Amino acid sequence: MWNNEWIKEKDYPAWGDTEVYKKTIGGGYLLTGESPYDAYKRVSNTVARRLSRPELAETFFDYIWKGWLCLASPVLSNTGTDRGLPISCFGIDVADSIQDIGGKNLEMMLLAKHGGGVGIGIN
């Protein structure tokens, strides 16, 4: 949730000083008590640690803070948390049988129903 006491360029980036940004990021992207600054640090540190390249954390943060790198919704919401995966799309491989085509079609429809993008590999 957006906190009106946050300070521009300390708690959120200068480019985020718009009603659209405040409404969007305050609408579920942040953890309880977390500012945009904290969220960007969480993502940057987690990604750098996952890559075994801790020296990249500050570079990732700077790119996000300057608006040079825009994070997909699940990346911002879920990276460094236990509340979901940082993924926007799903991949499905389909075998050459009527049964598999039907089963994978159902899987694709269920993923799409929940907002997931789906890529299909047909063998």
Roles of regions detected by a PLM:
Residues 1-123:
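Extended catalytic cores of very large enzyme megasubunits
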